[in-house]
Amino acid sequence: MTNINRPMTALEWALLVLLSLLWGGSFFFIGVAVKEIPPLTLVTLRVSLAAAILLLILRSLGLALPREARVWRGFLIMGLLNNAIPFSLIVWGQSHIPSGLAAVFNATTPLWAVLLAHVVTENEKLTLARLAGLLSGLAGVAAMIGPAALRGLGTDVWAQAAIVLAAISYACAGLYGRRFAAWGVPPMATAGGQVIGSSILLTPLALIIDQPWHLPLPSMHTIAAVLGLAGISTAMGYTLYFRILATAGTTNLQLVTFLIPPSAMLMGVLWLDESVSASQWLGLALIGFGLACIDGRLLRYFKVAR
């Protein structure tokens, strides 16, 4: 069994940063598309189009999805844990609480991942340095979003609980998804199977609740945003997700939640000419310190230096 209580390699860190950029971009795509498309229909389009894209890529590479019943049961469970449940809870929760507060609750995903992994796995045990790093990263996310993110804390408790449950669902998905590598399923095939499973679960709900055939035809920029959300953030994103999960483990994978705010900040500076506030610099420093604690190499360097 792979030892996952090791520092991540440079390649794994690079893939994690790339994943944070892909998922950070999803907020832009969603912000454009949700103005014309209801949330449930948008989520269904996201996973359905991603499934079609991944199937085309798999076929062009001469690869096929596995046929074993246990693998397809796994795809359905991953679709439930990683898409259907958290997407629905987050959409509902964000309709009742500020998006900044929702982002802070969503950033608890790595905490739940490390606690659950400590209980149910043999090779992802909790250490003091890892716990300190996770708490520092969570504080960094809160600082980057700003003090306004914590307004409303303690009100709309059910909505806040929904976001926390979504974070727990993501953490459970990371643990459950480890088995696909053991079954010999390639990351791209696992990503394709998961979004197919999500599509099977979500399509009937979208048809019943939103009745999308009554919706007006979306504009071209909305269609482009949906394609970006499906192709870049979802198809490419989940392929990377399962690639990282196979070698770096659940806890390390969920660190992407801490990297998304800095990635979004970087994109804003480079492409939108946005400025960086003092609280964002503080948050960036806390996240960097937290990631260094979790990685462990910097702490070992100072120990040796002493």
Spans of features found by a protein language model:
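Helix-helix packing/entry segments at the starts of transmembrane helices
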Residues: 43-45, 83, 102-108, 176-199, ...
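Specific transmembrane alpha-helical segments of multi-pass solute transporters/efflux pumps
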Residues: 22-30, 55-106, 143, 230-248
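Glycine-/small-residue-enriched transmembrane alpha-helix faces in small-molecule transporters
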Residues: 1-44, 92, 152-179, 200-202, ...
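Hydrophobic/aromatic residues within transmembrane alpha-helices
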Residues: 33, 42, 46, 93, ...
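Transmembrane alpha-helical segments that form core, pore/gating elements
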Residues: 54, 113-115, 119, 143-144, ...
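Alpha-helical transmembrane segments of compact multi-pass small-molecule transporters, enriched
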Residues: 26, 49-53, 105-119, 135, ...
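Hydrophobic transmembrane alpha-helices of multi-pass small-molecule transport proteins
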Residues: 54, 76, 116, 128-148, ...
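Juxtamembrane helix-entry segments on the extracytoplasmic side of multipass membrane proteins
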Residues: 8-13, 35-40, 44, 67-73, ...
